[in-house]
Amino acid sequence: MGKKRRKHDGSGSSRSPSPDRIREARNPSQAEVAGFRAPPSGKPAMTVKQLREERQKLLHEHFGYSNTNNPFGDRLLAEPFVWKKKNQLLQAAGQKGKTTVAALIHSSKSKVQEIENVKRRREEREKEEELMQQQREELQREKEREHYEEYAQKEELFHRSNQLKKTEIRLEQNRAQLIDLIVKGLRIIKGERFEKMDVLPGPPHEVLETYKNEPVTVAMLEDLIADVKLHIDVDTTVVDADFQDFWKSLLVLAREALERAKKRKDVLDQLARNSSPQMAAEAAAQLADTVCPQIRDADTGIVLSVAHEIEGLLGGKSAAELDELEAQIRSKFEEEDIDVAYWEGILNKIPSFRARAVCLQTWHMMTQSAADAEREMAREKALKEEEEAKAARAKGEELEGLLLEEADARKLARAQQIKQDAIKVARSVEKDVNPNADGSFSPELEPYDEGEVPPPVRGPYSPQLWPFDEFRHAEILAPDDDEDRRAILKKTLIQKERLKRAGLEEDPEPTPEAAENDASLDVLDPAAKVTTYEEFVKKEKKNLEADEEVMASSSEHKLTMHYTWEEKYRPRKPRFFNRVKTGYSWNKYNTTHYDHDNPPPKVVQGYKFNIFYPDLIDKTKAPTWFLEPSDTPDTVIIRFHAGPPYEDIAFKILNQEWQLERFRGFRNVFDRGIMQLYFSFKRYIYRR
């Protein structure tokens, strides 16, 4: 605002000058060119054409540009530029001097030089950037190389660990391969123990030819070589770090066995293609290694008879002796007049025999270590069985003492009860005979203490009076028979409990006498007979209803508790056999969308818990159960508590209301050592 637009005359420049004006500005007039005079040296003046040619020459030499060929599309690139307005202003101000040709040429050359410098700096900068890019790429390649090496190491370690796992799996499944038995033998040498201490059935150089009475195939040997390479030059495991010499020697033997197996396979294939008698004879000779002695050995270049002599020379030497022999032979090569072929043949055979010696020595170590380990394991097993037998005997003696104490306590309580009853009866009789009696006993009716012998009296006397209810439903026995029967029952009970504790009790066919004793034992002590877990489970599985399923072990809720009696008794987990009652809920939705051919999903309708406590210390207290909150509102924890020596056990069940009526299936009983809790859930029927 407030600025006035500048007026331009016809001779002035504008924002968008026309091409004619540009050309006019570029092409100097004759008057302007007339100012280009020669210097005082007397050289002729340069014309506009010469100046134009000079500029074209400079552009072409330094840049390769011309008026027709340049990246700018300028057809007047070589024309000198004259700034007319500037010259007019300078001339009007009296500041314009003469423009010489030398100044124009110098200005053009300086600009060309400046452009060259800029171009050179740009090229240097591009070279620096290219060099830096190469350095960055090299650094990136170095990082990738390190990463790849790390990745390769991890991959190799992964393959090794997989190989060890496959070895362990094949050993567990009794389908061990050669590499598995070799690794197992080396681990036995290092002190590891296995259930079966079996190693290679023979020396490695023999097993590589025949394994399990069959020739070792090419595929088996190739797999063995690949597995052996995984154990060379590594220290992943103990069998790798301490047996490198063995693995390298085994690789040598495996490669030789592979070559022989391939030759044997080629001979058999050739024989299969051509079964002529001559070919069969040649094949048999090659397979038996009984070719003519005049044929030279392909490996050593010596006669086979001499080769057999060399094998006899090297066969019985150890690895150290073979190393010493190799050093001596190499020193012989410096001497003159020696059979080079013979000694080179020996040198070629030494690595094979050295590998055989190393593997044979390691195999002897395997067999010896396995035998020692078996003897040690047998001795440990015998000691363990002896300790278990001692513990069982001690436990049986302890149980026998407890049972005897319990029997004596019951007998004493029974005697005291009989004495008290006799006193009551005697007092009632005395009251009936003499109403004025003061409650004291007469000499005839005074009861005697246990163990007290009554004094001899003359004439008849009254026996102790027993209540009649004691004998209403009992079997009357003679005193001697009663004592004998009680002694037999006690002995039977002690023997059965002792065998049961020791884990030696079997289930023989019950005899009539044993059945009678068991029945009498139930009468004597109903809580003494305990149903075993196996008997109960066998019976319950037979009676399993169609809508019942055995509760999964995952329903058990783990508890972490400490008990005050842990120092006296070793806590044990009770055994259980629980069932889940399932069924279909035929509500309105299910009846609409399902039928009996396509039923809805089953839902839990109840539970049946059977917890076994056969060895409770205090059998007078029945186990109890508690309901505790769970981690979800739809479930609840039911915990069973019995006391020593049993831990508490808990299960996660659905949080629904129970039916507590007996005719609805509710059962809460502790009988014969089994805590039984049966219940069903209430069913809600909604009506409009």
Curated annotation (Swiss-Prot):
Gene Ontology annotations for the cellular component aspect, listed alphabetically: cytoplasm; nucleus; spliceosomal complex
Transmembrane segment boundaries: none
Keywords: Cell cycle, Coiled coil, Differentiation, Nucleus
Record keyword Secreted present: no
Region (Disordered): 1-49, 431-454
UniProt keyword Coiled coil, yes or no: yes
Main location: nucleus
Coiled-coil zones: 108-182, 248-275, 365-406
Result of altering residue 646 to H: Does not affect nuclear localization. Reduces self-oligomerization and inhibits G1 stage of the tachyzoite cell cycle
InterPro entries noted in UniProt: Cactin_C, Cactin_central
SMART domains: CactinC_cactus
Compartments, record wording: Nucleus
Any single GO BP term: regulation of gene expression
Quaternary context: Homooligomer; the oligomerization requires the C-terminus.
Protein role: Plays a role in pre-mRNA splicing by facilitating excision of a subset of introns. Involved in the regulation of G1 progression and stage differentiation of tachyzoites. May play a role in gene expression.
Family: Belongs to the CACTIN family.
Protein name: Splicing factor Cactin
Species in which this protein is naturally found: Toxoplasma gondii (strain ATCC 50861 / VEG)
Taxonomic lineage of the native organism: Eukaryota, Sar, Alveolata, Apicomplexa, Conoidasida
Gene behind this protein: CACTIN
